[in-house]
Amino acid sequence: MSKSSFYCFGKSVRGREHRLSGLPNQDALRIYIGKDNNPVIIALADGHGSPVHFRSEVGSKMAVDTAVDILSSVRETDIKVPNKISKYPTLITREWNSRVLLDHKNKKFSSDELGALYDEVKNESFVDYVRLDPKIGYGTTLIVVASYGDSMLYLQIGDGDILVVDDTGNVRKPLRDDVQFSRYQTKSLCTHGASDDFRIAVEKNNGANPVLVLASTDGYSNSFKSYQEFFKVGIAYLDLIRILGCDFLEDILEDLLCKTSSQGSGDDITVGLACSSDLASDHGFIFP
């Protein structure tokens, strides 16, 4: 298959805890479909949402926009050149920094924002540090899944998950897990040297592998008792699409994620799905 084609969709829902506290959804999602479905890009981000990162809702939106704006101009042949691939984290980080600093220049941190930060940390020196390095206020993760012809690009900084499902139902992660100090600390675009914290991989797409790719913020996997249970989502989605089709899953996805958050992590959940066009168009009821 020289030109891969995917049907892409996704949803982002506000978590139970954020609904109760009045905090907006800190996640962001953007899906880009290029000419002739080449490239296809899913970008999602999870703004940290803590009092320290009080503009992370803005930061996450800028992260997905930055990733799509940069990667949508990448040529299919570029994906096969390691030296070019290795530059994407630097390009994305540098552009995200520029955008958040411009946002801060146009809208300086208010006394209310800095006051709330001080109330949380009780440390004037740290407040001064954030004032001098404003990108901290915009902290966010970033996950990208992109298809360029017969190549798949996976790129990530921070927590969250990418699951790849082949036509036999085998589920795996194309990237190593983020090394974190704890469940509540993760790598971020806002930290110094962020470009070095990206994990990145390019894999061949042969049509049968993958047939489905799921990208999600950590609010999804944290809603399950174990990663083994979370991996079953990939198989369940594949089976559901084969029986009822992508349109059905797309229609119920928002309600499904809201229920998962309410019964699980309580966090915002964002999911992006890339389903091979052959799988998306080949479904029907299956009877024993």
Across the structure, where does each feature detected by a protein language model lie?
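N-terminal entry segment of metal-dependent catalytic domains or homologous docking segments
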Residues: 1-72, 160, 189-203, 263-272
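C-terminal catalytic subdomain
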Residues: 184-288
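Short hydrophobic beta-strand that contains or immediately precedes a catalytic carboxylate
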Residues: 42-46, 155-157, 214-216
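Catalytic core of PPM/PP2C metal-dependent serine/threonine phosphatase domains
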Residues: 79-163, 198-207
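Short acidic-glycine loop/turn motifs at beta-strand connectors
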Residues: 33-36, 147-150, 158, 165-170, ...
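PP2C/PPM family metal-dependent serine/threonine protein phosphatase catalytic domain
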Residues: 9-23, 114-135, 139, 164-208, ...
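Helix-loop-helix
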Residues: 65-108, 232-255
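Short helix/loop capping segments that flank catalytic or ligand/cofactor-binding pockets
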Residues: 52-53, 153, 164-166, 223-225, ...
